[in-house]
């Protein structure tokens, strides 16, 4: 009880806290999320078609991006339901564009940007200055859109890379949640997550899925290990406070940096080959 109280106090007092709420079926949702993503990527592998993989992952993950845009928008605009609807639309459209492959990422970013600019032109009821308002709107919608679009587009570069990232991030999230939800400090969870990620990285090192070799898979695993905890902190920075309610954003937080950076590196890797 005392440990739980200390945990909640830390979350409340830290602007960039990464909370581990245990109420509700968190583990069930986490397992379903993992099955959905792996199943979508595996569908592309089974069909031996990168387009199928990108479309399937976008279909699974884009609604979560839209929900993250809605919940993050709600954290910033709790009394303005129209605003959070627009951030949800921008996040969803930006994310689903990833089904078009690598070009879908910048296209999705522009689509999300256009939606937000259109909203700014239509709605005049905010007290915030336009630039400040745009900053908050962009925070609510664009990072999750780019992350999901990048994850979907990664399948067009290499289905093996897409599945590898999903496995590494899922391992990190599982270890982080299991240990972090019972810890009174902010370090034990991420450390446990990195141990889990390292175990999966070792298996991938043995398998060496295309397009990786023994060196590149280790490099990509290290990048994922750096990006996962930083993505969680970035998610906190996107909210008014780190402990604000946005479970869909938290479902995607480890991908916020990992997916775009992996996509860029994977493009470089395949270009060299």
Feature-to-residue mapping (PLM):
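Mixed-charge, low-complexity intrinsically disordered regions
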Residues: 1-4
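Short alpha-helix carrying the canonical HExxH Zn2+-binding catalytic motif
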Residues: 171, 188, 231, 248-249
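Interfacial loop-to-transmembrane junctions
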Residues: 237-258
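Transmembrane alpha-helix interface/packing and boundary motifs in multi-pass membrane proteins
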Residues: 226-227, 246
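Juxtamembrane boundary at the C-terminal end of a transmembrane helix
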Residues: 264-273
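Hydrophobic alpha-helical segments of membrane proteins
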Residues: 194-206, 230-237, 259-264
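Perimembrane helix-loop junctions in membrane proteins
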Residues: 75-78, 236, 270-271
């Amino acid at each position: 009880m005392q440990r739980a109280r200390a945990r909640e106090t830390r979350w409340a007092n830290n602007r960039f806290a990464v909370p581990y709420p245990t109420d509700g079926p968190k583990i069930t949702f986490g397992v379903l999320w993992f099955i959905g993503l792996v199943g979508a990527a595996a569908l592309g592998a089974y069909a031996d078609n990168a387009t199928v993989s990108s479309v399937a992952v976008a279909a699974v993950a884009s609604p979560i991006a839209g929900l993250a845009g809605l919940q993050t928008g709600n954290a910033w605009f709790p009394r303005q339901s129209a605003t959070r609807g627009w951030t949800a639309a921008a996040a969803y459209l930006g994310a689903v564009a990833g089904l078009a492959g690598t070009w879908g990422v910048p296209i999705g970013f522009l689509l999300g940007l256009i939606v937000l600019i259109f909203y700014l032109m239509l709605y005049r009821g905010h007290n915030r200055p336009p630039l400040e308002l745009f900053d908050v709107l962009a925070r609510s919608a664009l990072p999750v859109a780019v992350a999901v679009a990048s994850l979907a587009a990664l399948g067009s570069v290499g289905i093996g890379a897409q599945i590898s990232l999903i496995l590494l991030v899922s391992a990190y999230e599982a270890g982080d949640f299991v240990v972090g939800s019972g810890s009174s400090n902010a370090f034990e969870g991420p450390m446990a997550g990195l141990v889990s990620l390292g175990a999966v990285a070792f298996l991938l090192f043995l398998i060496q899925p295309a397009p990786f070799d023994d060196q590149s898979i280790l490099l990509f695993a290290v990048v994922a290990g750096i990006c996962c905890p930083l993505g969680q902190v970035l998610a906190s920075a996107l909210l008014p406070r780190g402990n604000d309610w946005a479970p869909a954003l938290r479902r995607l937080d480890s991908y916020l940096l990992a997916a775009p950076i992996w996509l860029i590196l994977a493009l470089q890797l395949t270009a060299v080959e």
